[in-house]
Amino acid sequence: GDAPAVIAKGGFSGLFPDSSDPAYSFAASNQDSAQWCDVRLTKDGVGICLPDIKMDNCTTISDLFPKGKKTYLVNGVSTTGWFSVDYNSIDLTNVTLLRAILSRTNRFDGSFTLVQVEVALSQYKAPAWLNVQHDSFYSQFNLSMRSYILSMSKQYTVDYISSPEVSFLKSLVGRVGRKTKLVLRFLDEGLVEPSTNQTYGSILKNLSSIKTFASGILVPKHYIWPVTADNYLQPSTSVVDDAHKAGLEIYAADFANDFALSYNYSYDPLAEYLGFIDNGAFCVDGLLTDFPITPLEAIGCFSNLNNTKADHGAPLVISHNGASGDYPDCTDLAYQKAVQDGADVIDCDVQVTKDGIPICMSSIDLMDVTTVASSQFASQAGVISDIKAVAGVYTFNLTWEDIANNLKPMISNPFGQISLSRNPRNRNAGKFMRLSDFLAFAKGKKLSGIMITVEHASFMAEKLGFGVVDAVIKAVDDSGYSKQSAQKVMIQSTNSSTLVKFKQLAKYNLVYKIDEVVKDAAPSSLADIKKFADAASVSIKSVYPESSNFLINQTNPLVKSLQSAGLPVYVYLLMNEFFSQPYDFFSDATSQINALVHKGGEGGGVDGLITDFPGTAHRYKLNSCRNMGDKTPYYMLPPQRGGLVGVIQDKAALPPAMAPEPVLTVSDVAEPPLPPVSNTTAPAPSHAPVEVSVSIPITAAVLVLCASLLI
């Protein structure tokens, strides 16, 4: 059948205030999405597009009319606020729109006036969807929503009309054009539909009756994929098949890339859309979303892919502590998931235990990644200034048996402070891995290589009497990696001295990690890096400079400079959580990946991706819209750098100007050789009291507040 429709709720309301001119214009530029307008009527019967019947929730009305607060019955519920029925359209000329969801950027607030329905229908060249949420409310004020909608449908092309009120839709039957689809909008199952006095859950059980007055239904997405109380998916319902059997189209609502998705989707909104259109069992007829670009990607480029296909071509997908977005860092489960998800390279951050065993652990401080703070070893916490200024319990304070038998892993939560927690059911799942365990696991897997990251080599040599370079080489040799060529061994470090030592002793692929944000590398520093490294890893901000989560109009030459010197470039650190991405990437990890690897123009042109979520990056490599040249769909082109900032009207709201990033110089790269391994033991830390924090779930209201404070 036809591809599912994409309906832009209030335009591109995930970026701009819902129902604003830039929201509609931006969505209309996508061409393939319909424009949704929530119709409200003014005192003089003019239609405006507004997402909320309470104008104070989405406009500056209360500032202009501070005494305008009223209380009315809305579907039988006493509701207090500012209402469009109290104002003539001319009164609203200077009222401007605000974001309706506080966790979104406020930099577009107060800059755009209300859009009348006639303007929305005539100016934005896209299919039109008019939603009438409260017909019975307007009738209290002698305003006929029915007459207004019929008038609009005669003057303009209206493709869809929806309402949660059965009587309103029935009043339109036979009075609108044959091409206009009438759609019954379902609210939560327990709410009562006002004209039938039945709950929406009851109406759902008699879909055949809906066919007499509507061609389709619009349901909240949880009607199709319900979730548990702790936000995991339950088995899908039969509602899609039931609707189709009744001859009804079915549209799913409530999609937004920056909402809390089910943990099954690993914070990947594209994966959620695919669950509704490409699951092998059913496909909805449309998706109502605040971010129309992501479902367009899903439909146009990511449907019907063979996700099991191995593809070790560019961009190289390198895990970061395994699939650490789904399981605790560097555990057996994280590595298994990374391989399962199609990583090309899996990685191990090497630390050392008290008994001299190299292990895979993302931090040298066990407080960061294990349950040591609540164990019998918490009393060993202390400060070692060579490593960090706050107290920690370090891997070299405990033996391997201490760690493996008494501690549990702890999943990383980079955005836990705003309740974007990772996979809480598995927060302590998995087993720790020695380097030897990691090598044995990786060998024989469908990988192009492994990456071993080595930091603190000087400290280990001087203060612990441990030669980590020699230990890594021995472990690699003992595992048989030196006698095979199917998987290459990569060594990554921020220290040139460490890589120089490896180059002297073994033939590995050496990756220099540039751990500061730089715009370019001086020719002399490039020549120096080439002496000891085969590739470089750089931060995302070095590729896409940003200010306050907006891309700035600046293209850094760093990637091209490194590549011109013969150094492939891997970018770190990719995460799926929307809070990790500038707004220009639409709260969509796939959009960010696409921009980073795109060659030419506004693209980053990198050769590899270091990511907590290798499954998202691997799926990108398989998409059907790659290598299309001039025929690449517009939604698969990278954003214009600084383009979104250019839409900000209020100069006071502009992100602060950024100081120029430095250029990487020889002095940044050059280091003295690694010191010889001393005959010593681990230093005794200076003890300090340790505060143990307990993670407590935060309510949705607090989440919104915290998120807004971080913008």
Model-predicted segments: where are they?
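Phosphate-group recognition and catalysis centered on beta-loop-alpha active-site segments
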Residues: 1-711
